[in-house]
Amino acid sequence: MQTLQTTSLRVADNQLFILDQQALPQEKRWLDASTVEALVGHIHALRVRGAPLIGLSASLLLALLAESGHRRDELAIALETLRAARPTAVNLMNNLDRMKQALRQEDFVPALAAEALRLIDEDKQLCDDIARAGSALVKPGSRLLTHCNTGGLATAGTGTALGVIARAYAQGNVQNVWVDETRPLLQGGRLTAWELGELGVPYQLITDSMAASLMAKGLVDAVWVGADRIAANGDVANKIGTYSLAVLAKFHGIPFYVAAPQTTLDPHCPNGDAIPIEQRAAGEVTGVAGSFGAVQWAPENAQVYNPAFDVTPAALISGWVLDSGVVTPEDVAKGVFRTEAA
């Protein structure tokens, strides 16, 4: 396969490398991800993360394994193992469905490579399309609040919600970005803050519990988040804490937008209750670990509830910004997401 480079993915010498997102921002470190075991381990450890990026990394790995001589039956097993790596992220399922079609072709080796590269190119384009559609909703002088990380670290392109923010800033319409630290793994404080700094976008880092105070003081004009899965009724699964922001935004009369590619839609999932929610390790809540070391602050025997995602009901969402354009609550009520199954 040809040499390839995105913010978080690299293909060189027929090997796949991922940018270790657990090491950022203290260290920029590339890790080998050229086996199924390695990539699944990186996904579980969130060294590679973001729904679009997970799907793209799995697709690239399958193509590279095919080129290295793996048989069709071996690739089919690898595909199913990768599919199970992150159950909430539907982009992974959608991308691998396309790779499965390529695997069925007689000349499957070049077909897999072509499909993986096509997915990369499509992701870059849809990020641009999302940014174009979403930035039109950002008014001059906006103070925006965002959660988790939805930029180039999570995609092959400029990002989803963060791509909208970056484009709106380039157009002169963003005054400031409030960045939720995003407990427990601090994707906002570590990754989004780093990306905005690299882009030169003014931001202020806050703890998750400060959002309500900011909204009450009139310091937030809109909330922008990404999505790991969008159900047919418009419910959205995203990083834990998203639902809280949506409730707060609704109470304070602040627009709440979800930016995501069409690959995040799951028209076969009727509503948020049907979305599987990944439960993660207690250690993520009882302490913190990173390239700086590890600290535990909770008692050794503390019992922990640690879902990676929550579900935001469609009734709390002002608009879904896709690469195909802006979808309104009225559109969703008419079943626009359900028709995607046709």
From Swiss-Prot:
* Stored SUPFAM superfamilies: NagB/RpiA/CoA transferase-like
Keywords per UniProt: Amino-acid biosynthesis, Isomerase, Methionine biosynthesis
- The EC number(s) given in the record are 5.3.1.23
Pfam name, any one: IF-2B
Positions of the record's site feature: Transition state stabilizer: 148
Q: Which GO terms describe its molecular function?
A: S-methyl-5-thioribose-1-phosphate isomerase activity
What does the record give as the active site?
Answer: 228
Catalytic activity as recorded in UniProt = 5-(methylsulfanyl)-alpha-D-ribose 1-phosphate = 5-(methylsulfanyl)-D-ribulose 1-phosphate
- Give GO BP annotations, semicolon-separated: L-methionine salvage from methylthioadenosine
The entry marks the following residues as binding substrate, namely 49-51, 86, 187, 238-239
Q: Under which main EC class is this enzyme filed?
A: isomerase
Under InterPro entries, the record lists: IF-2B-related, IF-M1Pi, IF_2B-like_C, Initiation_fac_2B_a/b/d, M1Pi_N, NagB/RpiA_transferase-like
UniProt pathway: Amino-acid biosynthesis; L-methionine biosynthesis via salvage pathway; L-methionine from S-methyl-5-thio-alpha-D-ribose 1-phosphate: step 1/6
Q: Which family does the record claim for this protein?
A: Belongs to the eIF-2B alpha/beta/delta subunits family. MtnA subfamily.
Query: What does the UniProt function comment say about this protein?
Result: Catalyzes the interconversion of methylthioribose-1-phosphate (MTR-1-P) into methylthioribulose-1-phosphate (MTRu-1-P).
The protein depicted here goes by the name: Methylthioribose-1-phosphate isomerase
Species source reads Citrobacter koseri (strain ATCC BAA-895 / CDC 4225-83 / SGSC4696)
